[in-house]
Amino acid sequence: MALRGPALAVLAACTLALTAAPATADDLSGTIDIPCAAATLRQSADWYRPSGSPRGLIWLQHGFARSNANMADLARTYADAGYLVFSPSLPFMDLSGCTLQNLGDNTAFLNNLAALFSGDPAGALSASLTAALGAALDAAALPQQFVFIGHSAGAEAVEYVAARLHQKYPQAWAGLRGLILLDPVMSFLGDNTYRALTDLDATGLPILTVSGPPSLCNSFGSGTVALQRTLHRPFVGVQFDTGTHTDAEGASSDMLGDILCGAPHPANVKALRTLTLGWLADFFAGTTTPDYYPTGDTRTAATPAASGSIPAVPDARVLPGS
């Protein structure tokens, strides 16, 4: 029987879910409680604590049929740079629709996920950090400023949650400094990506992507195409023409990830981290460091899209919005 398009992608993702790198001892392993229909899911959640006072909080979300173990290497990079990182593992299959990606209607679950970031000091997010820290309760206060980073289908989830904060939680929305999308992928069903980005487009919230070329594992660039079509901005990120879908995972990818989606390219892994660390620093500080944005632009009134190159990653292709 021949399988094409989404069916092949689902098969590949299900195979990927069978293996994941184990958590290492230098993270703070824990759980997070998320309401799901009439029940509560208790999901694995890793925290990565910086050595000093956190510069901000990062929610780092894995992709379809992956787990937080596949984000461990990237999470440590961000923690080493001074950020407190929250990395939960979310289901990709659930009979009640409580899934990372949309397989029917997962919006109720994503609404519950957004509530984690509502700012409740006695909420599930604070409880998860406190439990993970154990005796080190002096560091349990959550930073009030945060950035969401999502890989693959995790990018759609962070887009949706950001839009939900904008619509329902104004105090929490004020603390959201930006979104970073890593080779984003739209769900096979529904329009969560387009609805979220349409809501966010006019807000001025920084939203940038690091994408690879179209492939089976990124649903042929569906999330990147949606971003470029929906955001009315001259610059929405970059594409690495030699990129693979696992570049974001780096050393936390695995054999099946490498076989099905391509092994991470060391040069691209390094460039992705250089660029996203630069963007993170700018998002939290409210600055624009020239090294991480297009220079040598040839924009005119007739051709307003960003062009040129980015000094920190000169080989990257600059992606304009609409």
Each predicted region: which residue ranges?
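Primarily recognizes the serine-hydrolase "nucleophile elbow" in alpha/beta-hydrolase
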Residues: S128-R195, L200-A202
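Secretory targeting and sorting signals
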Residues: M1-A25
